[in-house]
Amino acid sequence: MPDFVIVLINLAFCLGAYLFGSINFSIIYSKFKKNDVRKLGSGNAGSTNVLRNFGVKIALVIFALDILKTYLASLLVYFVNLYAFKDSVVVFHAVAYCVVIGHIFPIWHKFKGGKGAASTLGYIISVNIIIAVIGAIVYLLIIIYWKRIVSFTTLITIPSLLPLMFIPWMSQLPLGFIAYQWPWWISPLVYVLIILLVIWSHHENISRMIKGQEKVIKWNKTSK
């Protein structure tokens, strides 16, 4: 297959991934409830703000859907490469990255979306679910036993997983079947770019944390 065709195919998949990532379930749900999550609480169109304003159950559903956006896009690329192209043509890392970009800057919602934490988790699972499990444990330990500030916990947890991405066999094991067909170093490289995106999306949270004004999470079990 000519190189320019491969480039065009990847660009098409990346565009589709961005548009898919731009589907924001937090906004869709809040619109269904005749509201706009971006006008409530922190103004963030993510599962944490949904938790504060609509309850635990729907927040967990949206969190799962945001994870699945990236993971399913990566899985689709894996099967397209396997059965349609019979070769590693579409770079799943780039597709996953574009899903995260779409989640943070959704074209369907005036480029104001979520912070990208859940969609980042979807990428991590695509590389190796072991890293995701370790990340979940770190996250829970921090938020339960140290600080109940979601943004702080996210900004600590996501970068802390980077060293694991640099372990070659993490993306070469059967559990990393989506990533194994690519050189191991691509996963940490793309992950660095995702970390930078997530940090930027939290710039307002960082400012509030410096001022001591960032909200502490409250576990509300009831839905509004």
From Swiss-Prot:
Disulfide linkages recorded for this protein, renumbered to the chain, are none
Which keywords has UniProt assigned to this entry?
Cell membrane, Lipid biosynthesis, Lipid metabolism, Membrane, Phospholipid biosynthesis, Phospholipid metabolism, Transferase, Transmembrane, Transmembrane helix
Write out the annotated subcellular location.
Cell membrane
Pathway of action: Lipid metabolism; phospholipid metabolism
Q: What is its EC number?
A: 2.3.1.275
Subunit structure, as described in the record: Probably interacts with PlsX.
Give the protein's biological function: Catalyzes the transfer of an acyl group from acyl-phosphate (acyl-PO(4)) to glycerol-3-phosphate (G3P) to form lysophosphatidic acid (LPA). This enzyme utilizes acyl-phosphate as fatty acyl donor, but not acyl-CoA or acyl-ACP.
* Protein name from the UniProt record: Glycerol-3-phosphate acyltransferase
Q: Which organism is it from?
A: Mycoplasmopsis pulmonis (strain UAB CTIP) (Mycoplasma pulmonis)
